[in-house]
Amino acid sequence: MRKTKIVCTLGPSTDQPGILRQLLENGMNVARFNFSHGDYAEHKGRLDQLRTLSKELDVSIPAMLDTKGPEIRLGEFENGKEQLTAGQKFILTSRNVKGTKEISSITYKDLPHDVSVGGRIMLDDGLISLRIESITDTDIVCTVENDGVIKTKKGVNVPGVHLSMPYMSQRDRDDILFGIEQGYDLISASFTRSAQDIMDIRHLLDEHNANIRIIAKIENQEGIDNIDEILSVADGIMVARGDMGVEIDYAEIPSIQKHLIDHAMQMGKICITATQMLDSMIVNPRPTRAEITDVANAIYDGTGAVMLSGETAAGKYPVEALKAMAMIAETTESDTNYESLCHHVGMDSTRLTISAAVSHAACTTASDISASAIITASKSGETARLLSRFRPDAPIIACVLDETTCRQMNVYRGVTPLLMDYAHSTDELISMSVKAAEDAGLIHSGDRVVVTAGVPVGVSGTTNMIKVHLVGDTLLTGIGINPGLNAKGEVCVCRNAEEAAKKFKAGQMLVVPFTTNDTLPYMRQAAGIIAEEAGANSHSAIVGLTLGKPVIIGATHATRTLKDGMKISMDCARGVVQAMSE
């Protein structure tokens, strides 16, 4: 089960018949809606289609609204685009003019008051560099430093300059209100500079009683400098490397990426690494070797999610890009040292709570017993977030009560959310959550799982209990020999050595009334041994210890209860034999 989540941006390419369905079927975890492009009708149409297909395919996919943010763009060009030549003069103006080879209007009218002579302005994600020569109240006269084609509405970046423009524009406010009305689950806040930027959005959400999680997009030096205060109020961050690579020295991006991912991981917050991850797949069916390594390194660093932008929104190969991303993630995860990751995150005494301590203990317990999963029943999803922080190898199954929380949990690394009904007691909570996970095919009879919950039931933030639970119906009990060993397999009931000689096959679970030296060859080949005879000095016990085999002795009526061909599991530590689902 892949732990790293994949965010796919919807756009014209995903509007093609059948494409969105294929993305959902091939592992898309989050759908991103880029509000820098398109209108409300387009976004609503895509959201409606997402909700319809998600329900049909029974998947919980959150919708993420990516705001336009306090960005600066060029105005309209008479011919749509112009060729600029190194050495020529080019004017950026706050006046409303049609763009030509010599001049373009800009969307931020106070930019002439924020910049200085000698500074640099970058156009179109840094493809064209301008050096500021002189400034008037309305015009910024620049020298073009390199050849390039400039187009209508392309972005403008001013590296190292604090802009006095307000964070949330009326456009962003309207977009967020639209998102509240339509039921979006996440907001990615573009160009976040400070904690106050996030609080401005949160106040707007609170005014409308909206349960939407906020992810701060870190794209400039201010955001990097203020990362701790931003993380303290945001639900997570996006390492948005596109504008970041224009706003700061691009050679610093790898170290900044590691720094941001680590901060988010230490604080248990969502972390999405984004921009140009498989950029070549916009036009090519396979990624470059450098892109493969880029995705893998972000996962090695601990990112919780990776994002596809133009690859799925406007590319020729949206489904292939998703499949490639998923394959890279799965391969990288198989080579990840989870104990080292958990140790790296550790327990921070400044953020130590009972819930955090229990979550950490659940992760270490799951590692110690090689649990098939960690199951948490949570009203708010907070426990799932805490578990995800410690990056366990075992998948985290979060059983929640409402659809919005269920969708929101799908952005957290390693978390698979499930809907369940309200439980009235702790025992009911455990049984219902285990059954929900079993019904979903995430765990199976015979699996050992770690369950966390809160007592009393139904109170948020009270996770204070851990239980190791064996999934399935108990068929037999006895005394386990070699308690550190377990086995699963197909039953072969043999009442004596002659019967074993006729039908026993290597790797089966040997079920006998007792053993003798004549059955020794079959004991050697068995996956596990279940004997009715009891006693620590019995033949079965002594041979089991000598061979280092999982053995349960004293299993009364085993040869009558178990039938040939049954699939069972045995847990020597507990002396339990359970039925496995087919």
Q: What does each model-identified segment do?
A:
Residues K3, C8-S13, E42, V161, ...:
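Conserved alpha/beta-domain cores
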Residues P70-S169, A436, L442-E498, Q525-A526, ...:
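Acidic, glycine-rich flexible loop/linker segments
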Residues L352-H360, T364-A366, V468-Y522:
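Protease-associated
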Residues K44-R51, T312-D335, K467-H469:
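C-terminal helical cap(s) of enzyme catalytic domains, especially alpha/beta-barrels
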Residues L10-P12, N29-Y40, L186-F191, I237-I248, ...:
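Glycine-rich phosphate-binding active-site loops on the catalytic face of alpha/beta enzymes
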Residues T9, N34, D66, G118, ...:
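Conserved, mostly hydrophobic/aromatic
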Residues G38-E42, R46, A394-P395, C399-L429, ...:
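Feature captures the catalytic cores and cofactor-binding loops of soluble hydro-lyases/lyases
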Residues K5-V7, V30-R32, S60-M64, K89, ...:
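Structural preference for beta-strand elements that scaffold enzyme active sites
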